[in-house]
C-alpha cells in the first residue's frame, strides 16, 4: 500500500531536498509501521550524541582548540579560527539529529500505540525523563556554540505543519531548557528503572539520571551568573532535589574495545592513521606550574606541577605553541608529546567519556557559596581521583595533599582555573567558562606572543594570529552554517539581524558573556 509517514531526519532545519527535516517515506503499511524498542532507540541516541560531540572534528578541530587544551601538530589554520564550512554544516546537522533521536524516545513513551509495549524496557515516565535530560545536555552545547538556534519548532516538525524552524532567542532558550530539566526530574520514579537495558550512561538507574538532571541544572544556572540573579535560587533548588554526591555519580559513556564500538578519539588517530593533535603550550604550562613570561602573565600557583599533567599527557615537558602559522609546525612540535607513539588514556579504544563530573559540580558549588574553600578543595581532590581512575593511573594521598596545599585557598581565579583543568576533553564547556569568567588568563588571546621565533631567537616572538575577525578576543561563537542561509533562509536572516553588526560573524557574544575586554572578569549577580 502506498502511504506516506513523516519522521525527523534532522538535516538543516527546513524542508528541502535531501537536507530536509521532514522526509516522506513510501510503501509502508500504516497498520504495521516498523517499530524499534525504546531501549534500543536510547542506546543508539546516546552513542550518536557522544560519537559526534567527542570526536576529532567537532571536538578535535573546534572545541578543544578553542579551549586551548590541544592543537594541531601540522596544519594550524583551524586553531586560528579558519573554520571549514563543510564541517560546520555537517555538525550542525549531526547534533540536531541527536536531538531528533531523543525526541523520538520521548514520543515512543507517550504515544498510546507504543507506550504500553515500551514499558517493558523501563517505566515510561523515567524513559522520557532520561531522554529529556540528555537532550538538554546536548542542546546546551548547541546553543553555546552557535548562539540563538532552533529548538521550540524542532519537535513540531513531524507532528505539526511546521517546515521551517524559527531560531529561539538564547536567553529564552535557557529558560526553556531549565524548565525541561525541572519537568524531567519531577517525573522520575526512583523505585522504577529508567531502562532495563540499552542505557550506556547510567545502566538504567533512574536515581542517577535524577542527580544528573539536577547537576546539569546547576551548570546552566552558573552560566547565567553574570546576567541573571536567579542563578542562585536555581542552584539551591537543584541541590535540595539531589545532585552528584561523588565520582561514582558522574555522567559517563563507556566505550568498548571489542568490535567497532570504540572511542572516536581513538578512531581519529589509530583507525584513520593520523597524528594530528597534541597538548598546547598554554595548557601544558598551566599543568606544569610555568608562567607565561613572553606575555608577562604569572601563574596562580607557579612552580607546582599538577598530578594530572602525567595523566593527560605522560611525561609532558612542553606543549605546542598555540596559534602559530603552519610554516613553523615542524620545528615547534619538536620535543612535544607525540600521542600517536606514546598513547595517552583518552586515545584508548574503550575510554570512558565524561559528560559531567562530580568535580565540576563542586567547583560550581564553591562559586555559588562565594568561592568556598571546602567545595573548592573537594573538587580538586575529586578531579585528580576521577582522572587518575579514567586513565588507569594512581596518585598518592600525599601527592594530592601537597598539590592542594600548594594551590592554596579558593579565589574566583583559582576556582575557574581548577574547573578549567577538570573540564579536560569537554571543550565546549571549557570554552564557555573562558567566555563567562575571562579565566584562565593563561589562555592566549589573538595578538599575544605564542613562542620565540624558531628560526631566529633574536627576532620578535611569533604571535597568535587569528584568520577570522574576532575583535582581538578568543572566538565568541561559531557562524551559523551556510546551509541554513539557503534552506531556512527567512529564519536565518532574522537570527543574523540580531547579531552584532547584523552579520553572521565569530565575535557576537552569548547573552551570558558580558566581558567588556579580553581580560575582564565580571562579578556575579
Functional labels for PLM-detected ranges:
Residues 1-30:
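Bacterial Sec-dependent N-terminal signal peptides
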Residues 21-68, 74-79, 85-86, 104, ...:
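Membrane-proximal, proline-rich intrinsically disordered regions
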Residues 49, 140, 144-147, 188, ...:
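Specific register positions within alpha-helical solenoid repeats of the TPR/Sel1-like families, i.e.
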Residues 70-152, 156-196, 351:
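Conserved, well-structured interaction surfaces
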Residues 172-246:
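Internal, well-ordered domain-core segments that constitute the primary functional module
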Residues 231-365, 370-422, 426-429, 437:
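Hydrophobic-face positions in mid-chain alpha helices that act as interaction patches
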Amino acid at each position: 500500500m502506498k502511504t506516506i509517514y513523516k519522521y525527523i531526519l534532522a538535516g538543516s532545519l527546513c524542508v528541502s531536498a535531501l537536507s530536509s527535516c521532514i522526509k516522506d517515506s513510501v510503501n509502508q503499511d500504516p497498520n504495521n509501521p516498523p517499530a524499534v524498542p525504546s531501549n534500543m532507540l536510547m542506546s543508539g541516541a546516546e552513542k550518536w550524541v557522544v560519537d559526534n560531540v567527542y570526536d576529532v572534528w567537532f571536538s578535535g578541530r573546534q572545541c578543544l582548540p578553542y579551549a586551548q587544551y590541544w592543537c594541531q601538530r601540522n596544519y594550524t589554520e583551524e586553531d586560528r579560527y579558519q573554520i571549514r564550512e563543510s564541517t560546520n554544516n555537517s555538525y550542525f546537522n549531526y547534533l540536531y539529529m541527536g536531538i531528533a533521536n531523543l525526541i523520538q524516545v520521548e514520543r515512543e513513551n507517550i504515544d498510546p500505540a507504543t507506550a504500553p509495549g515500551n514499558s517493558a524496557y523501563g517505566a515510561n515516565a523515567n524513559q522520557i525523563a532520561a531522554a529529556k535530560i540528555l537532550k538538554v545536555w546536548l542542546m546546551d552545547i548547541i546553543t553555546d556554540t552557535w548562539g540563538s538556534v532552533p529548538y521550540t519548532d524542532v519537535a513540531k516538525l513531524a507532528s505539526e505543519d511546521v517546515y521551517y524552524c524559527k531560531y529561539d532567542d538564547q536567553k529564552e532558550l535557557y529558560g526553556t531548557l531549565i524548565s525541561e530539566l525541572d519537568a524531567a526530574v519531577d517525573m522520575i520514579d526512583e523505585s522504577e528503572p529508567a531502562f532495563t537495558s540499552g542505557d550506556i550512561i547510567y545502566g538504567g538507574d533512574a536515581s542517577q539520571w535524577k542527580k544528573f538532571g539536577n547537576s546539569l541544572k546547576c551548570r546552566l544556572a552558573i552560566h547565567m551568573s553574570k546576567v541573571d540573579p536567579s542563578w542562585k535560587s536555581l542552584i539551591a533548588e537543584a541541590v535540595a532535589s539531589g545532585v552528584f554526591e561523588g565520582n561514582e555519580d558522574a555522567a559517563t559513556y563507556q566505550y568498548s574495545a571489542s568490535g567497532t564500538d570504540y572511542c572516536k578519539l581513538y578512531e581519529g588517530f589509530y583507525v584513520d592513521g593520523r597524528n594530528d593533535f597534541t597538548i598546547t603550550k598554554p595548557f601544558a604550562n598551566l599543568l606544569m606550574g610555568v608562567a607565561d613570561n613572553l606575555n608577562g602573565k604569572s601563574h596562580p600557583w607557579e612552580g607546582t606541577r599538577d598530578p594530572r599533567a602525567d595523566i593527560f599527557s605522560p611525561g609532558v615537558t612542553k606543549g605546542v605553541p598555540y596559534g602559530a602559522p603552519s610554516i613553523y609546525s615542524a620545528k615547534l612540535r619538536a620535543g612535544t608529546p607525540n600521542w600517536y607513539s606514546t598513547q595517552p588514556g583518552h586515545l584508548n579504544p574503550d575510554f570512558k567519556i565524561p559528560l559531567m563530573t562530580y568535580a565540576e559540580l563542586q567547583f560550581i558549588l564553591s562559586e555559588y557559596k562565594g568561592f568556598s574553600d571546602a567545595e573548592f578543595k573537594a573538587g580538586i581532590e575529586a578531579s585528580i581521583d576521577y582522572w587518575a581512575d579514567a586513565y588507569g593511573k594512581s596518585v598518592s594521598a600525599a601527592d594530592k595533599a601537597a598539590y592542594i596545599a600548594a594551590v592554596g585557598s579558593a579565589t574566583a581565579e583559582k576556582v575557574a582555573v581548577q574547573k578549567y583543568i577538570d573540564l579536560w576533553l569537554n571543550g565546549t564547556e571549557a570554552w564557555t567558562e573562558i567566555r563567562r569568567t575571562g579565566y584562565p588568563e593563561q589562555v592566549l588571546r589573538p595578538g599575544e606572543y605564542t613562542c620565540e621565533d624558531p628560526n631566529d631567537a633574536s627576532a620578535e616572538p611569533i604571535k597568535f594570529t587569528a584568520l577570522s575577525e574576532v575583535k582581538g578576543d578568543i572566538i565568541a561563537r561559531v557562524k551559523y552554517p551556510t546551509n541554513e542561509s539557503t534552506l531556512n533562509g527567512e529564519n536565518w536572516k532574522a537570527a543574523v539581524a540580531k547579531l552584532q553588526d547584523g552579520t553572521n560573524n565569530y565575535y557576537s557574544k552569548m547573552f551570558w558573556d558580558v566581558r567588556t575586554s579580553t581580560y575582564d572578569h565580571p562579578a556575579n549577580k
